[in-house]
A protein has these predicted regions:
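Short, amphipathic alpha-helical "recognition" segments used to contact nucleic acids or chromatin
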Residues: 6-24, 68-77
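Mobile genetic element proteins and their domesticated derivatives, centered on retroelements
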Residues: 15, 29, 40-43, 70-71, ...
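Short alpha-helical "recognition helix" segments of helix-turn-helix
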Residues: 26-33, 86, 90
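Basic, flexible linker segments flanking DNA-binding modules
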Residues: 45-138, 143, 202, 213, ...
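Mobile-element integrase/transposase regions
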Residues: 65, 96, 101, 105-164, ...
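Acidic/histidine-rich, metal-coordinating catalytic segments
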Residues: 174, 183, 187-208, 230-232, ...
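Charged alpha-helix within mobile-element recombinases
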Residues: 208, 215-300
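C-terminal, beta-rich DNA-binding module of retroviral/retroelements integrases
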Residues: 271, 275-373
Length: 373
């Protein structure tokens, strides 16, 4: 499976962006990136990580045609970018001052944007967590064919607060094993989020009491809270949907790929640009890397033991996902087979219990409605 492999300079840039945060722990950051403190200090001491451009910063005699060519060059390189982003990047990178409205007019005049694009680009009004790693979104960007007759299933995980892309992985399928391995690598480098939100599809959705999959049980045992989007409500995952539109417009629709290795190479290049160069309108045109910091919750070497508070009735889940409580059989989830679950009495409701896997409430049941033994 083609795991993403950053160049030395990309790794250095990603490290430096995170190392310059006021609250960063340099030793922990070095461990997660697999570099020594000596290397970290050497990188931090350098004035730049690449040769600086020799392009003149100002050109007062620039013609209108030249200005339009610069706008179109940025748009052609990033087809999903609009007037505000292009104007911001031209000023930031080339010291070219141009109004966003002028950029939009140029794009319309050169047929780079359709009259309907403004309506399609209207953003959802959505909740934003107050800090990084409070919420990660996770989903697959559909799948597309490769010239070797295989298919690519892009796994995407952005941080909801900063829009920083944590995972962009080209997978051959949507099975648990590939997703869990990609998450494990991300947890080692970036730490654990407080919560992950997904839709209700495989491999993270299931039906029935508890509705858990093996992947979800693993995430819960790591101390991560889980939530699911409401069916047929894409605005719940609006930032993930927007990320997918950009990925499709700027990468998937612009290339024909031979195999997963080639896809991953292009994904890595685009991911770096998305995190470190692309301004995002919602957080004041800052790049995601400017707003992101790694989680202080490190990935544990082993899964912690499962514990429940006093007052819970603990039962071990038997084959088929069943537990027994007061001579009554309760169905949980087959993914919990062999694991202890907590049955927590519901206040002011005799015979009713909340069903818990570690910290996560996975359902409720009433003894009067269950199957008596």
């Amino acid at each position: 499976m083609p795991w993403r492999t950053l160049t030395v300079n990309q790794q250095r840039q990603e490290f430096l962006a995170l190392a310059q945060k006021p609250s960063r722990n340099l030793g922990e950051l070095c461990r997660r990136f697999g570099i020594s403190r000596k290397t970290a200090y050497k990188w931090l001491a350098r004035d730049t990580t690449e040769d600086q451009s020799r392009r003149p910063k100002n050109s007062p005699k620039r013609s209108n045609a030249t200005l339009e060519a610069q706008v179109l060059a940025v748009r052609d390189a990033h087809p999903a970018w609009g007037g505000r982003k292009i104007a911001h990047v031209l000023m930031r990178d080339q010291q070219v001052a141009i109004a966003p409205g002028t950029v939009t007019s140029i794009l319309h005049r050169h047929n780079r944007i359709s009259p309907q694009a403004g309506e399609a680009a209207t953003p959802w009004q959505r909740f934003e967590p107050p800090w990084p790693n409070a919420l990660w979104q996770m989903d697959f960007k559909g799948h597309f064919g490769l010239t070797d007759n295989s298919r690519c299933h892009p796994l995407t995980v952005p941080d909801d607060h900063s829009r920083y892309n944590i995972i962009l992985q080209a997978l051959p399928n949507e099975r648990r094993e590939g997703v869990q391995e990609a998450l494990s690598r991300a947890f080692v480098q970036f730490g654990l989020p407080e919560r992950i939100n997904t839709d209700n599809g495989a491999p993270w959705g299931n039906s029935g009491q508890g509705g858990l999959t093996a992947l979800e049980v693993w995430l819960i045992r790591l101390g991560i809270r889980l939530s699911h989007s409401r069916p047929h409500h894409p605005q719940t995952n609006g930032k993930e949907e927007r990320f997918h539109r950009s990925l499709k417009a700027e990468v998937i629709d612009r290339h024909r790929f031979c195999d997963l290795t080639q896809v991953q190479q292009q994904f890595d290049r685009w991911r770096y640009c998305y995190n470190h160069e692309r301004p995002h309108e919602a957080p004041g045109l800052a790049t995601p890397a400017r707003r992101y910091r790694i989680s202080p919750r490190a990935m544990p070497r082993e899964l912690p033991p499962i514990e429940y508070p006093d007052g819970d009735v603990v039962r071990k889940v038997q084959q088929g996902g069943w537990i027994s409580l007061h001579n009554v059989e309760i169905r949980t989830s087959t993914a919990l087979t062999g694991q202890p679950v907590g049955c927590r009495p519901v206040a002011d409701c005799d015979g009713a219990f909340g069903l818990y896997c570690c910290h996560q409430k996975i359902g409720e049941f009433c003894l009067s409605d269950a199957v008596k033994l």
